[in-house]
């Protein structure tokens, strides 16, 4: 596409700011930033000229990888607040003509996610298709590929000759 012919989109003139909730603003003094802390700082962010707030994962997670290992995409992690808090954040941002952009991790999930637990119980069943399962080669992983976090991208499923793929931590199986 020719940049000269590109249609201007609403976000082209907007200023975005990423918030990592865990370290942003802690309102309940537990040492962890929370959704209420983001709400509390909306006026400040608006005064800075921020139009779009990009929020790093705040879904339920065991926090092996700072929340990027999501165990439930439908729940807010209690460390950050509640779904009601999140609904309030959306309403308060809208009042200020601000947008909320959520960081959605779809490459992988947590090994604690219900789908992965079901896949482990039946590596040839329906949920196994949600992940990458491969047989090993002569007692070794299916390939010599390396994880971004070090070591093999393959983790053996205990008691089997099957491995699952994880480009990041072994606790973050890749989704198919």
Segment roles from a protein language model:
Residues 4-176:
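Acidic/aromatic-lined carbohydrate-recognition and catalytic surfaces
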């Amino acid at each position: 596409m020719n940049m000269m012919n590109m249609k201007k989109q609403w976000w082209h003139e907007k200023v975005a700011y990423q918030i990592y909730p865990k370290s942003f603003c802690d309102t309940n003094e537990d040492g962890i930033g929370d959704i209420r802390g983001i709400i509390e700082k909306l006026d400040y962010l608006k005064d800075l000229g921020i139009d779009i707030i990009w929020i790093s994962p705040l879904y339920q997670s065991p926090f092996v990888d700072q929340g990027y290992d999501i165990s439930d995409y439908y729940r807010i992690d209690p460390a950050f607040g509640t779904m009601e808090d999140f609904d309030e954040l959306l309403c308060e941002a809208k009042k200020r003509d601000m947008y909320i952009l959520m960081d959605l991790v779809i490459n992988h999930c947590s090994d604690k996610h219900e789908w992965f637990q079901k896949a482990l119980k039946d590596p040839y069943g329906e949920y196994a298709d949600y992940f990458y399962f491969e047989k090993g080669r002569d007692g070794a992983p299916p390939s010599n590929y390396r994880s971004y976090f070090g070591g093999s991208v393959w983790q053996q499923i205990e008691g089997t000759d099957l491995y699952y793929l994880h480009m990041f931590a072994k606790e973050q199986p890749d989704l198919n």
